Amino acid sequence: MDMPFCPPLEPQANTRIAFRPGDSLFSSQGQAFHGRGSLLQATPREAVGACAAQLLAQATEQQAEAGATPVLLGLLPYDPAGPAPARLQIPRVLRRITAPTVTLPAHHATILQRREHPDQAGYEHSVQAALARLNRNDGLRKLVLARTLELDLDRPLDLDDVLTRLWQASPHGYTYAIPLSDSGQDYFLGASPELLVRREGRRVRVHPLAGTAARHPDTTEDARIAQALLDSPKDRLEHAVVVEAIEAALRPLCCTLDIPAQPSLTSTARLWHLGTLIEGELADPAISALDLAIALHPTPAVCGLPTADARPAIAALEPFERGYFAGAVGWCDANGDGAWAVAIRCAQVHGPHLTLSAGAGIVPGSVPTLEYRETGNKLRTILDALGLH
């Protein structure tokens, strides 16, 4: 029987991922875990960390003779109390691959229908309501408001093509695909630029992104936009709130924690972001990467601050259930090492039907029209990879 373990790296030059319905994928640092089949799986609604530890312990026992280190792939919902459960899986077969360099032909799927939820007027109205709430000065400091774009296509997507395009377009990001059913037709997939947490031994790394501007094809104008983002009081405030919350969550868990005093610029093909690379050392080596992801999630980059007040405020303003959007996706092995990304730049796929989601951080000084535009720029990342316009 093929058993999951940390296998040797397989170069993928001029080849495809060979992703099949039912497979799973998570890429990080130029490599990806590609899982096929399921040795063990669970969909817990509570005690997710304990459930994952139990699955890994069972897999380790089964692989004792081989001396292998099992790897778990997982997806956490935005709201643990919501209708979507966590999804944890130890694949029956696991490959470790590099990004394919194959050149793919143009994608020819046609959009038959598109629906914004809410539309531009509705979204901007929600931003105005969020600003009114923030201006009450009742302790709420930031809200992240999202919207969805539903697409009906003339044919189902070729997931192997889509994931190849996503990975090639975001080589330094986190491309992922997690099945949502046994049919192979339902997926949550995307390419996140944002590292929620990485654990290697006792070393911890977190790289939150908050504060965004669209890039420009002219290099001079692009540089001006980047500098303006770095100098923006509104975006600096939005980012500082996120860093503050992450520090509060990590400080009790780490014996050392290094947090730069100022954010730096991070770019994708379409966007500039403010980012802060936070590094630390765990006080307790028993804390796993998944434990850290659960402790940090959701950060104010996707929810707000304070979380306990922001979550119900968002639920009152957003006319849809987020599900796995703004959740967390990644991997953890039996040693506790792993990497988890914020589940953004994403789509939920059901055959030829797609639901894309994107959000923007709202703080005092936010402009509704600009926030709507920001969500559109974020949606464009996934639309480009899908070859849809």
For each of these PLM feature ranges, what is it?
Residues I17-L39, G67, A84-A86, D152-L237, ...:
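An anion-binding catalytic pocket shared by soluble metabolic enzymes
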Residues D23-E46, R96-A121, H125-Q128, R147-D154, ...:
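Contiguous alpha-helical scaffold segments within structured protein domains
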Residues H34-I90:
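Glycine-rich, N-terminal phosphate-binding loop and its surrounding beta-alpha-beta segment
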Residues L72-L76, L143, T175-I178, R322-G330:
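A short glycine-rich, hydrophobically flanked beta-strand micro-motif that places a catalytic Asp/Glu
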Residues L277-H389:
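Conserved hydrophobic core element of enzyme catalytic domains
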